């Protein structure tokens, strides 16, 4: 049961830092490349979730890198 709950949490939280840094105003902090990873590392109050989210944010940010190059810094 615990494994199922953890699996669901990881799936729902995957790439959370990437989504937050791109969509919520003020959370990008001027980062253009890998804003989700930088958001996770910077000052996340959810340190235990950051450990789970960081690899997913890294993959998600890498997939969105071509878009980030043309978009410019996220504010």
UniProtKB/Swiss-Prot annotation:
The keyword Cytoplasm does not apply. To E.coli YidQ. InterPro entries: DUF1375. This is Uncharacterized protein YceK. Keywords: Signal. Residues 1-21 form the signal peptide. It comes from the Bacteria. It comes from Escherichia coli (strain K12). One of its GO terms (biological process) is DNA damage response. The keyword Signal applies.
């Amino acid at each position: 049961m615990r494994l199922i709950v953890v699996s669901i949490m990881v799936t729902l939280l995957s790439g959370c830092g990437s989504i937050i840094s791109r969509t919520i105003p003020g959370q990008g902090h001027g980062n253009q490349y890998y804003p989700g990873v930088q958001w996770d590392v910077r000052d996340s109050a959810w340190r235990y979730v950051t450990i789970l989210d960081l690899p997913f944010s890294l993959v998600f940010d890498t997939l969105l890198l071509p878009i980030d190059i043309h978009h410019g810094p996220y504010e």
